[in-house]
């Protein structure tokens, strides 16, 4: 019976918690949860928490669309139902089909919130 006591305790106490509970947390559980979140958040410097991604679309006629300096291309779109494109030098979208009427580049840069 001694060999079964630990597995039974595990099943009796921990498994219901893993399955979820509709009951609110008791004050001790809330305190533990709060401490875990604080410790987890302290792993990341505040500067990292305030970094975001600022994106917009640049389009042009023809098969090339360029993003401004300081930004990078994340994706491209091509006119004339062309789905074949590549990114050149991290800032230029190039549509590879013949007779492309327009090309669009999704340009993004990191932005630090104040």
Curated annotation (Swiss-Prot):
Q: Which body tissues produce this protein?
A: Expressed in white but not brown adipose tissue in a variety of organs.
Q: Name any one Pfam family assigned in the record.
A: Resistin
Kindly state which keywords UniProt assigns to this record, in alphabetical order. Diabetes mellitus, Disulfide bond, Hormone, Obesity, Secreted, Signal
Among CDD domains, the record links this protein to: RELM
Subcellular location(s) of the protein: Secreted
Residue pairs linked by disulfide bridges in the UniProt entry: 55-108, 67-107, 76-93, 78-95, 82-97
Signal sequence annotation: 1-20
Q: Which GO terms describe its molecular function?
A: hormone activity
List the GO cellular component terms: extracellular region; extracellular space
- The keyword Disulfide bond is annotated on this UniProt entry: yes
Q: Which InterPro entries match?
A: RELM (IPR009714), Resistin-like_sf (IPR036262)
Q: Its domain of life?
A: Eukaryota
Which PANTHER family has this protein been placed in? RESISTIN (PTHR21101:SF11)
Please give the family membership noted in the entry.
Answer: Belongs to the resistin/FIZZ family.
Description of how the protein assembles with itself and partners: Homodimer; disulfide-linked.
> What is the name listed in the Swiss-Prot or TrEMBL entry for this protein?
Resistin
Organism for this UniProt entry: Mus musculus (Mouse)
Higher taxonomy: Eukaryota, Metazoa, Chordata, Craniata, Vertebrata
Q: Which gene encodes it?
A: Retn
